[in-house]
């Protein structure tokens, strides 16, 4: 007589040779990942910079849409928006109030996310909607990751230290110190500080995006950076910086002798820096009074820059110099993004 086989034993016996089913990501997986990232990222330099997680979410979102899983893609988009600090619930609200969001640290990412929301929540049957979706995801991936830096610095991925040594020798080309995409250590920062002190009179721009910087590492560089007399732009995007650093930067900017000619500091795509405080923006504007594209909440809430006039003015450039899409809320009056 044969032995009685239970469902459990059959499952165990069949599992090694069973063909795996389609892989489906659980929505709660991304939610728990964001919670863990919020607790740990940026503390004492632990973990990877958040752009790794965000790029992974964009790629997974595109995969879901290709498979026709729009509901799951919408849920994942909510998690991505949460990770990027976009708390608005209505797509119309985002579009109509875009001018008031101009103090966002990374308007380009937010504009791409809004476009993604349109394709996911309000799909249009005509035209190549999937092609447009793929293009948006490529643009967002490119913007959130250091691909452009790898192209600028040949051999960066293979020999980052050799690349750093070459960049810190001689005078800065085009008056720019471009170290973007090169992972930096505390010891490297000492070499960078010495270089800035030696060649600081020539430096107009410093690029430190995607270098793995933490708050403490930026504070280590701050004395050298803040005394560069010709510095106009400072890029700190794609690192592990937190809101705590904004207090130090804002306090430094209150001193007119520090960062005397800086017009913009790029803090996008970091851990939890989603908007810039008004004292920070006002200090920048005092240094560049002729630049009218550094608005504050006070200006947008009073005087001639309110209501329809504020919306009509949103076709000027945003603080990082790229065109801002005008509000087009009338195109999506039925669309609401769930949170």
From Swiss-Prot:
Residues annotated with Phosphoserine modification = 322
Q: Where is the composition biased (Low complexity)?
A: 11-21
Q: According to the UniProt record, where is the region Disordered? A: 1-25, 294-339
Keywords (A to Z) from UniProt: Leucine-rich repeat, Phosphoprotein, Repeat
Stretches with biased composition (Polar residues): 330-339
Chain positions found as Phosphothreonine: 325
Instruction: Outline the LRR repeats, range by range.
Output: 203-216, 228-241
Q: Which InterPro entries does this chain map to?
A: LRR_dom_sf
Family, according to the entry, reads as follows: Belongs to the LRRC75 family.
Q: What's the protein here called? A: Leucine-rich repeat-containing protein 75A
Name the species this protein comes from: Mus musculus (Mouse)
Taxonomic lineage per UniProt?
Eukaryota, Metazoa, Chordata, Craniata, Vertebrata
């Amino acid at each position: 007589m044969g032995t009685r086989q239970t469902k459990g034993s059959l499952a165990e016996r069949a599992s090694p040779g069973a063909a795996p089913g389609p892989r489906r990501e659980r929505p709660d997986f991304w939610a728990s990942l964001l919670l863990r990232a919020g607790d740990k990222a940026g503390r004492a330099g632990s973990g990877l910079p958040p752009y790794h997680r965000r790029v992974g979410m964009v790629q997974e979102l595109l995969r879901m849409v290709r498979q026709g899983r729009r509901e799951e893609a919408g849920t994942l988009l909510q998690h991505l928006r949460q990770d990027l600090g976009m708390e608005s619930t209505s797509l119309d609200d985002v579009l109509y109030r875009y001018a008031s969001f101009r103090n966002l640290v990374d308007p380009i990412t937010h504009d791409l996310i809004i476009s993604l929301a349109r394709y996911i929540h309000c799909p249009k049957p005509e035209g190549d909607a999937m092609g447009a979706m793929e293009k948006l995801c490529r643009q967002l991936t490119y913007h959130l990751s250091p691909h452009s830096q790898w192209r600028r610095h040949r051999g960066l991925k293979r020999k980052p230290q050799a690349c750093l040594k070459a960049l810190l020798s001689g005078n800065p080309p085009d008056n720019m110190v471009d170290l973007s995409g090169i992972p930096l250590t505390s010891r490297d920062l000492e070499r960078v500080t010495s270089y800035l002190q030696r060649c600081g009179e020539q430096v107009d721009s410093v690029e430190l995006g995607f270098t793995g910087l933490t708050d403490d590492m930026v504070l280590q560089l701050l004395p050298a950076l803040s005394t560069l007399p010709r510095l106009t732009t400072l890029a700190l995007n794609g690192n592990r910086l937190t809101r705590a650093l904004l207090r130090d930067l804002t306090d430094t900017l209150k001193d007119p002798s520090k960062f005397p000619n800086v017009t913009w500091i790029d803090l996008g795509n970091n851990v939890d820096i989603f908007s810039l405080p008004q004292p920070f923006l006002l200090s920048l504007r005092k240094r560049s009074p002729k630049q009218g594209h550094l608005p504050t909440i006070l200006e947008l809430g009073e005087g001639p820059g309110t209501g329809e006039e504020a919306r009509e003015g949103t076709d000027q450039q945003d603080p990082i110099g790229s065109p801002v899409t005008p509000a087009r809320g009338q195109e999506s009056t039925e669309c609401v993004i769930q949170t």
